[in-house]
């Protein structure tokens, strides 16, 4: 815990955990190296993204690339990244803690522990994060723009 208490926000989170009596159920990891972050993802059973505002969260893409079953609030660009029921589970109101808990339990209690969702998430992420494919699409966009008649 001492490693965590370096910022006001980190202190706020630790105090909140204590207030709700869950400090022994939460592990605050603090800053992680890239390899430590990858291992933390791989050690998880479910990736949860309860954000109220998101565009295209890198953390969701990273979890998908690593094949984690994902639960996320259906806000911003998240539904365009993750198909509900196929590549993970989305819940409607980001502040609905019961819906979030139900989605996590649905994955944990499923026969395969969310493995099928994780495999589908990885397949989609490999396709959408393919550097060569994305570079080719971007090149086509630029060529189209260059071919348009200039005023």
Regions found by a protein language model. Give the residues of each.
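Short hydrophobic beta-strand element within catalytic cores of glycosyltransferases
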Residues: 69-72, 82
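Short alpha-helical segment that forms part of, or immediately flanks, the ligand-binding pocket
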Residues: 38, 57-65, 79-80, 86
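Short alpha-helical donor nucleotide-sugar binding micro-motif in glycosyltransferases
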Residues: 31, 39-44, 100
